Amino acid sequence: MSDPRYPIGPAPAVQTLTHEQRQERLAHLAALPEEFEAAFAGLSDAQLDTPYREGGWTLRQLAHHVADSHLNAYVRTKLALTEDRPTVKTYEENLWAELPDTRAIAPSLDLLRGLHRRWVAVLESLTPEQWARVFVHPVSGPNTLDTMLAYYTWHGQHHTAHALNLRQERGW
């Protein structure tokens, strides 16, 4: 792996997906909670408090970050479907990772399971026109739901790979 920050490569560029590409990414999004949880299964507190790379977040912080990030993406999905080009709010992900609810990872893993069931149910129901709906991010600009699906599929796999790579590297 050449860059430990991006074990599966960089985030995808803005794109329009075909029906087949959407179905493939939806399957990945549906499977993510189980795969993500398996990457954290059986880890001790000391292991969870280990950064996945020098200067990076701990595995514990990654577990909470993915739940927080995907929760925000779910809300952005619903905003894009119910409002005309809504401007979404950013959040301070580094500060969220330090809040008192970030000790035990089980609640975040539970949240991810239920969240992904609901999120995938919404996404599976979309028409081609709805996939083109847009929300506006203050930093990245306009994002279609296609772009959002591609990004968050990558995001989940990206952080799962961080955990799996550290486990392999340390023999856990």
Curated annotation (Swiss-Prot):
GO terms for molecular function: hydrolase activity; zinc ion binding. The keyword Metal-binding applies. Zn(2+) binds at H65, H155, H159. InterPro entries: DinB-like, DinB/YfiT-like, Put_metal_dep_hydrolase_YfiT. Binds 1 zinc ion per subunit. GO terms for cellular component: cytoplasm. It holds the Pfam family DinB_2. Its EC number is 3.-.-.-. Keywords: Cytoplasm, Hydrolase, Metal-binding, Zinc. Its cofactor is Zn(2+). Homodimer. Possible metal-dependent hydrolase. Belongs to the metal hydrolase YfiT family. HAMAP family: YfiT_hydrol. This is Putative metal-dependent hydrolase DR_0841.
